[in-house]
A protein has these predicted regions:
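PLP-dependent class I/II
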Residues: 2-28, 36-42, 46, 50-68, ...
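Glycine-rich loop-to-alpha-helix module at the N-terminal edge of alpha/beta enzyme cores
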Residues: 35, 72-75, 88-92, 97
Length: 395
């Protein structure tokens, strides 16, 4: 009797390395997650790395989610999202950016987080060799979208002020460009583009026949000095041909609920919904019901508190190093002073020795010159951590 020897070797345990795809092998684990894992092992760390609000979910949203569970609304929803939430989204977009939907041209789909919306949008748009322009620095998942979809991410260098302007974007556009992915307010820099800058980008994309994707997960975290007419500037105010991606997790402190939405050209939104059918199926049902009343929540006290924390960061490093003033979100992208002769990675390794956790800039960029601070932490802890970082720079 002949025994078959599998390609991975003699009979016995599976050769797992042979089974893992080249796609998976090409993607590194998130540098942010590595810092989170380190924080879990440290005793009393000063954690300035985590990118989620430190305030509780508004009571009205908790009650709505609990009521949905108690009413046995725990099964699948339609892929696009429950009608009640879609209605609330369109009412909000009408007031916020002037979009009147749904129409034959405009559609929306509720997604499993904004990250879910972004990956589904990339899947719907990119074929092998297609290009998408992303900012550098970028949110960590942006740079991996090419490996996940077969497309190519073209990094738009925004140093030193971290403003992704039309002039900078145009240098990156080629005949293979399908889309420009913009994030304002941005992660990791907190940059908020002005209405004039956004209109220039809208005009550029229209002229080049390129789709503008606007990741606005932090749109409610826009500080008073960056708001225009009381709102966070958005390219959607100038065009209904951009793809708008927003969410609830960062805004209302419910990041674990995994809920966002994509709105924009209906033909593209329908393709995103099709991919959702075969991946996430639908966004979490009880979370959808939970956020229906969210648009009526007053966030101004929380945003004002974060604006004060922003000022703590800016004041700490004034005259010591370069920190472009964040206009929103809850991050600052801090340059390691050149006189120290250190990379961002080397600096954060020393910070860890002082119990301070920040994220090295090379997680978000092709450069290794900066680090990201999250000021979404208690003011006393923030002050302690900032004092240590300042001391490291001035020692």
């Amino acid at each position: 009797m002949t025994t078959h020897t599998p390609a991975g070797g003699p009979l016995g345990r599976l050769s797992l390395s042979r089974l893992i795809s080249r796609r998976a092998q090409s993607i590194d684990a998130s540098g942010i997650r590595r810092v989170f894992d380190l924080a879990a092992k440290m005793k009393d760390p000063i954690n300035l790395s985590i990118g989620q609000p430190d305030f509780p979910v508004p009571t009205v949203m908790k009650e709505a989610a609990k009521a949905a569970i108690d009413a046995d609304r725990n099964g699948y929803t339609v892929t696009q999202g429950i009608p009640e939430l879609l209605h609330a989204i369109w009412q909000h977009l009408k007031l916020n950016v002037g979009w009147h939907g749904p129409t034959d041209e405009l559609g929306a789909v509720v997604t499993s987080g904004t990250s879910g919306g972004i990956i589904l949008a990339a899947m719907a748009l990119l074929d092998e060799g297609d290009e998408m322009v992303i900012p550098d620095p970028y949110f960590v998942m942006y740079n991996q979208l090419g490996k996940l979809t077969g497309g190519t991410m073209v990094r738009c260098d925004t140093y030193p002020d971290f403003r992704m302007t039309a002039e900078r974007i145009e240098r990156c556009i080629t005949p293979r460009t399908k889309a420009v992915l913009l994030c304002s307010p941005s992660n990791p820099c907190g940059t908020v583009l002005s209405g004039a800058e956004l209109k220039d980008i809208v005009d550029l994309c229209r002229r080049k026949h390129v789709l503008l994707i606007s990741d606005e997960i932090y749109d409610e975290f826009c500080f008073s000095d960056a708001r225009e007419n009381g709102k966070c500037p958005s390219p959607a105010q100038f065009s209904d041909e951009c793809l708008l991606i927003r969410g609830f997790g960062k805004t209302y402190g419910c990041t674990g609920w995994r809920l966002g939405y994509v709105a924009g050209p209906k033909d593209i939104v329908q393709e995103i919904a099709k991919f959702q059918q075969y991946t996430y199926v639908c966004a979490p049902s009880m979370a959808q019901w939970g956020v229906v009343p969210s648009f009526g929540v007053d966030l101004s006290p929380m945003v004002a508190d974060y604006e004060k924390r922003r000022q703590m960061v800016v004041d700490t490093f004034a005259g010591i190093t370069s920190v472009p003033r964040p206009g929103g979100a809850f991050y600052a992208f801090v340059e390691v002073p050149k006189r120290l002769g250190m990379t961002g990675q080397q600096f954060i390794e020393q910070a860890i020795e002082h119990r301070v956790l920040v994220i090295p800039g090379n997680v978000f960029s092709s450069r290794d010159t900066h680090f990201r601070i999250s000021f979404a932490t208690r003011p006393d802890k923030l002050a302690e951590g900032l004092g240590i970082l300042r001391g490291m720079m001035t020692a």
